[in-house]
Structure formats: structure tokens, C-alpha cells
Amino acid sequence: ITDLTVGYQLYQNRELDELELSESTLTTITSDTSNAYNDQLCEKRPTKYAYDFHFNFYCLNSDGTPNENWNKAVANRAFRRCFQEGLNLIPYYARFNKINPLKCENNYYTMKGVCYNSKGTDYVDLVAKELGIDGEKYDGETMVHLRKSTADSIAALKKQAMDELTAIGVTFPVKAPFFFVAGNTVAQDNATVLKQCFTDSFGDDFIQLELGTYVSSLAKEVRIPKLHGFVINGWGADFGDPVNFVGQEILHDDNAYYSWYYSNSAKVVEAGPADWQKDL
């Protein structure tokens, strides 16, 4: 059911056993403990996929010309660090789990207990150490990546990114093209909440989501034409094989589908990196 207003009416009439809720309906129910449906909410079953932001380093405009403003911005390490260290996604997580939003936080490609190195160390623990979040656990209150961040540290990182990018001709706010399927109220609500997360985290003078829609195929209408600033995609195949997934992201051979059609980093290498792409 793509029209959740109609779906909610069907649920109220006992014509449906379960239903995903629109953002407005969910907020209405959760904000009132006496609501008739407040005690009927339950967490959805987790999927087997690891969902991640996938940046596009070779974004094009609709006319096929390079989106230089975004491409220069996303190539900057301080700019990307703002996503990792300053973007509060709890309201967005709540779109998928209103009861325990932070259960949706995903810091790794691979789950714990899946693979170990020759010394018996869990692969996830090795990654956590590299990320500086070793030992951090779910607490139901804060995102792991934001625990070491302060308002001052994020303001300084934002200023660094803006100063470095202004010097190479980037104008602000940087628009990040983000697409959702047309006619789907859930997808529209998700995108709207995500856009607000950027506003709440950084203000409107730095990064803004530029929302767009596609009709039926994200791949054919958005990814292959390279129109996205980033996409959120789930990795499910070979979930226990981190080498395969990392290879998909960073290698440039013909089989590295992600680097050719998601990040387009292989295109950058093929064309020859510009001076401002040296960090990549």
C-alpha cells in the first residue's frame, strides 16, 4: 500500500493486520499515551542488509554536465567528516524504528561474530579501533559516532570545510541531490525527515538536501545517469565477506560494481583526478 492514509483507514476498519505508518500518524500515536493504538506499536523485523550512505564523487547535472559544486565538496575530507561526526540521524532512524531508533545505527559493513582474523580478533573490533570507537556500545540515547563530538568541534570542522572549499570556488550551501520514488508517501516522509536532519545538524548555510523523485527505477533513472549526490543502499550479498564489499568500494576493475555505479570513484581514476580530488 503506497498511500498510507488509505492504509491506516483500512487498519482502523480491521481490514489489515499490520501497516507501516506515515510520519504524521506515527507522531500522533506516539505523542499520546492514551491513543487507542499506542500499545499496538511494535518494532519491525530487522533486515539482513547493512544500509550505508554511498557518496557519488562524479555527480552529473540533468543536462550531463559535471555537478562541480557537489563533486568538489564531497572530495574534501573535512566535508565528509561532517557527515560522520556531526550528522544526527536519530529522527531518521525513528522512521524505521520509532520505539528504539538507535537500534538502526550501523557503523560497520559486517556484523559481530561473523569473521575473525588469524589471531582470533573479530573483524568488527579491528574496524572499530581504526574508527576510534572501540568499546562503544549501544546505549539507546546517543549515536556512537557523535559521542566524541561537541558543538565546538563540529563548528570548527564545518568552518575548515567551508574555508577549504571556498578557496577552490565552491558556493554555499552545497546542494546534495537525493532521490526517492514518486507517489510513495513513506519514501517522501523518509526523505523529508532526512533533509531536516541536515538542517538541525548543520543549519541551512552549509549542506542542504535537494530532493528529487524517480518514477520506477533508481538505477536507470538516477544511479546510471549519475544524478545522485549520495544514495542509501543496503548490502546483503556475502555479508560475512568484508574483503569483497571493501573491494567493491575501492577497486577499479570491471567487477567493482559499487565503484563504477555508486561512488563512481572508478570514473574519477579513469579520467584522471583533479587537484582537489587528491584526498580520494
Where in this protein do the model-derived segments appear?
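Short helix-loop capping/hinge motifs at secondary-structure junctions, enriched
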Residues: C59-F79
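Periplasmic binding protein-like
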Residues: Y11, L16, L21, N35, ...
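Extracellular/periplasmic catalytic domains that process cell-envelope and extracellular macromolecules
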Residues: P46-K48, N76, G169-F172, V222-K226
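Structural recognition of the beta-strand scaffold that forms the well-ordered cores
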Residues: D17-L21, Y51-N56, C82-G86, Y93-A94, ...
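Extracytoplasmic/secreted cell-surface and envelope-processing proteins
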Residues: G7-Q9, T27-S31, F53, S62-P66, ...
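Extracellular/periplasmic solute-recognition and catalytic clefts
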Residues: I1-D63, A94
